[in-house]
A protein has these predicted regions:
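Conserved alpha/beta cores of soluble small-molecule-handling proteins
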Residues: 1-121, 137, 143-199
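Short beta-strand/strand-turn micro-motif
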Residues: 123-129
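Short beta-strand-to-turn element immediately C-terminal to the catalytic PLP-Schiff-base lysine
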Residues: 133
């Protein structure tokens, strides 16, 4: 049976971006199980720690929310990315099955993470959406592996612009940022010369 995840940042007792997570969870359930009722996260939240950053992990499926955990979170530093080609990968929904991503991640060699290239277009790392800076604007791939909740928020705020970004266009960009529900905007940034093709 298909199972999916929402990973939510809890920052000093504040559960972040619940509306975006709730919308994606219910959109996913409607896609796979059209008759499924909408769920509200508020009814499933555990006791929330009042200090520090925590990862709230919600596993759900056809029958609703199945598992909720809340654990301390530490950002894993990323200082280099291996560009990995994977034309057939599909991770449009945040599934518990990450086996395809894990196989690609295992090919990273000495680099910290991977940046997946699908049909010549940049998509995402193994865990995060990306944005690249051209000196004036932050562009995020129009067709990422997964349309993350932080990505949706940044697009709604006008901070990001969607654009197809081809690998050969990388010299036009100076900086890449990684972000997701747990990694805030500006928290993970590196120069584009830290991206290395591994084909």
């Amino acid at each position: 049976m298909c199972r999916f995840i929402e990973t939510i940042r809890v920052d000093c007792g504040e559960v972040r971006n619940t509306a975006y997570h709730e919308r994606r969870m219910n959109d996913t359930r409607t896609h796979f199980w059209p008759e499924s009722p909408a769920l509200q996260l508020a009814g499933y939240l555990p006791a929330i720690p009042g200090s520090g950053v925590h990862k709230l992990r919600i596993v759900y499926g056809q029958n609703g929310i199945e598992e909720v955990t809340c654990t301390p979170y530490t950002l894993r530093p990323v200082r280099s990315l291996a560009l990995i080609q994977a034309d057939d990968i599909d991770y449009a929904c945040k599934s518990t099955d990450r086996s395809a991503l894990n196989r690609l991640f295992a090919r990273r060699g000495a680099y910290d993470d991977i940046l997946i290239v699908r049909r010549h277009l940049l998509t995402a790392t193994s865990i995060a959406n990306i944005a690249l800076f051209d000196g004036s604007h932050w562009h995020t791939p129009q067709h990422p592996l997964l349309k993350g909740t932080k990505r949706a928020e940044l697009l709604d705020k006008g901070i990001l612009t969607e654009k197809d970004i081809r690998m050969e266009e990388l010299p036009a960009y100076s900086t890449i940022r990684l972000f997701n529900a747990m990694i805030d905007w500006g928290e993970a940034e590196l120069p584009t010369d830290c991206l290395h093709p591994v084909f």
